[in-house]
Amino acid sequence: MEQAKTLFFTTPKQVEVRETPLPPLKADEVLVQTICSAISAGTELLVYRGQFPQLSEAHDAVSSGLKYPLAYGYACVGKVKGVGKAVNREWEDRSVFSFQPHTSYFAAKIENLFPIPHSLSPQNACFLPNMETAVNLVQDGAPILGERVLVLGQGVVGLLTASLLSEFPLEYLVTADQFEFRRQTSGKINKVISLDNLNAGEAKAQFHSSGYAQNTFDLTFELSGSPSALNDAIEYTAFSGRIVIGSWYGRKRAEIDLGGAFHRSRIKLISSQVSTISPELSGRWDKSRRFDVAWKALERIKPEKWVTHRFSIDEAEKAYQLLDENPQEAIQVLFKYDDVV
């Protein structure tokens, strides 16, 4: 009998792949064979390192709570291999996306599946959750014609956000990251000026020599995953500017200086999380409309060019060790299944 291989986080910095029988199909379900799944490094490293908070509700639909052992992940692309009795057979062999943990097979109801546009490869489709996040960030930031925008952090979400922002008629768009590889990648995006991260003295000197003084930016996105970066965001955001905080920090802590210029700067701090839609938009926007925007953005940007590493699901330990110990070498890491990719 065919077995499903599922990745489990068992304790901090320990993962294992478990084999289980394929789930029996209910009448309203389909069986999906996974082609590839994407590691969301920022979120999954919190789980891998044991830095996630104990939540009464998970931040997504994957599980109702975060505790070990935990099957986690939310970016699976696969092909429908079987359909339940109540499901239209047109679903057979259809390529689909689902918010599922890393697993080689899974059963799902069709309302939890997203048909993938024919113009997108499976690897491009793996970026859907992060693209939806980027769309949500840009909507929450609401950039205005001629604004000066700064994006701190050029991981996958930062690169996608910068790519969307590059389509706006801004005065300038600046990105910053501590890793040279990510800065080089970001600098290839149209209209982006990519600089070193702002923490070190040399980096700040470079920033100022480039003509970007303190209190410069109308809109800043904090996407680095480091709570201390909020100090940089505050320092470089102009009077009455906005800071959109898209990072999930988990249990990471940092001292934030709110006693200086921040007190009189009237800066607005905006927490942005993709599970909801901003109240200002929810009367006209729903998740379906936002997903449509995300699919179209994937077709334009084609982010699979940012896939730096591909591992078999059986090599999961190597994948997380890479992201944990050598993050400067990686951008997007994918799992592949049965050499399909």
What is the meaning of each model-derived region?
Residues 75-99:
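A glycine-/small-residue-rich N-terminal strand-loop-strand element
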Residues 184, 188-270:
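Glycine-rich cofactor phosphate-binding loops and adjacent beta1-alpha1 units
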Residues 285-341:
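C-terminal hydrophobic helical "lid"/dimerization subdomain
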Residues 214, 256-307:
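C-terminal substrate-binding/catalytic core of Rossmann-like NAD(P)-dependent dehydrogenases/reductases
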Residues 89-91, 143, 237:
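Short, well-ordered loop/turn sites that connect or cap secondary structure elements
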Residues 121-199:
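Mid-domain Rossmann-like dinucleotide-binding core that forms the NAD(H)/NADP(H) cofactor-binding site
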